[in-house]
Amino acid sequence: MRSYLKQIVAYCLVSLCPLSLLGQEQSKAVQLPKDWHRSWQEGAQGTRSDEALCFLLRKGKKPRPIRIGVIDTGADTTLLEIRPALYLSPRELPNGQDDDRDGYVDNRYGWNFLGSPNGEIELTSVGTTAFREYKRLLPYYKGMKEAPQGKEEEFAYFRRVAKMAGIERYERLQAVTTSKVKAFHLLDSVLRQLPNVHRDSLTLGQLVQLDLSGKEIEAAGELIAPEIIKADSTTAWHQLVQQEEQKLEQINHRLASIERDPDKRTLLGDDMHRLSSRSYGNGRVSGVGQEHGTFVSSVLVGGGTIDPTVKGVYTPAKLLTLRAVPDRGDEYDKDVAAAIVYAVDHGAKVINMSLGKDLSPSEYLVEEALRYAQKHDVLVVQSSGNNGRDLDQQPIYPTGLTSSGKPFPNFLYVGASTATGARASFSNYGKHVHLYAPGEKIWGTMPGGQITAEDGTSIAAPVVAGIAAMIRAFFPRLTAPEVVELLFKTARQGEVPIVDALAACQAALQKK
């Protein structure tokens, strides 16, 4: 406990210095300081999380260790900025055995729900949920214009996901590209027959000077004219023909692969429709696409080893790294649900989920997992998404609502705010977006140690999760719903309610 307190005191000593300089930097109308989201003043309306931490220490409060589950793309476990904060399972050795008998082999830092146990399969690009659902239903409804009797609802769903996935648009692109390729071939056959025209060295600039006539040729020329205009005049004719042929080949391949190629997620070995079936995945939490999860982790617990002003919101917390979000495409409901259960079972009191999607065919699994988190008093923080839309009209999943539409009391939906206290233009909003937090020009660390600034509700969520972890560490008797209510009631009111860590901690001190 003494070393834990020592770490927090050191954090405060470093953090107070930038606070004293904040007014100087802003008065000169220079760019925002890198730690603005952890402080506050006019023009830099952050969360006062640094001040809150120092306030608690001055009041003689002693925190308990706390773990945060980070459900994301994984993280760079070698990165010095976050490595000291990664929870290391004390009884698990990298020996291919389940040493601590928790059902997971070699889960030293957390768990990877995107890979097979032997590591031969690793899901990196999985497509949107709408595309995957279209792919699943295509064998049953291919070519149908009307619903089979008794299948009206599912057929309507099939048509809906086809539209969401852009299948009809892609099929139209296939038809247009096919016509263009035919036009290219027609014109190419004419050029081959012309005397004194060297087709293999002919440039587009030379092509447009040729006197070609005939209805079919003119129609073909009109069809491919846009491609010729877009290309450089020095481009060889035969190269443009090849490019269009390759484009069509790629389109045909992609459409054919919808039926031909299996959904690799089905090869991981679990029952995707049962949450109890969790014996899949592996312990490799680093991998392709880990940049997002690494940055989110640094916003939570970054140590400031590269730049002392670029630190996490609550550095003493320990992270459970849960790789459940692919590099490209939508996360699977089953993986998110399984990751929530893992985090709960392994001691997390706060879970950060900087993820979201437009469709959730197995929403019941996530609801089951959120009920499990609620039962074990775990607070879940979810980013609201970056579509700039009203979630009351078009939701993002998970919604944080039960199947009956009732909000989970242990769930926080977080939008992004700007330094001026406004809602960020990209941030989703709605009556169930409880809080906002800085999500614009937030500094953190990427794999390899690169310091950079990012925007997004994905960044606002860990700001809130870090504050929630701080409160739960210093006030362990407060339940998850009580912390949610506390953060909501003490939020700074303005255009949008912005989380205020100092006000929340002051209120918590009076409460218990």
Language model regions located:
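Mature extracellular/periplasmic domains of secretome proteins
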Residues: 53-63, 288-290, 311-314, 330-352, ...
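Bacterial Sec-dependent N-terminal signal peptides
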Residues: 1-26
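A cross-family glycoside hydrolase active-site/sugar-binding cleft signature
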Residues: 323, 352-356, 383-384, 415, ...
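Active-site glycine-centered loops adjacent to acidic/histidine catalytic or metal-binding residues
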Residues: 72, 385, 456
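Subtilisin-like serine protease catalytic core
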Residues: 54-68, 73-331, 408-410, 428-432, ...
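C-terminal subdomain of the subtilisin-like protease fold in secreted/lumenal serine endopeptidases
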Residues: 344-355, 362-364, 376, 409-413, ...
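Extracellular S/T/G-rich loop segment that most often corresponds to the catalytic His/Ser-adjacent loop
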Residues: 378, 399-473, 477, 481
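Short acidic, glycine-rich surface-loop motifs adjacent to enzyme active sites
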Residues: 27-38, 145-167, 171-174, 181, ...
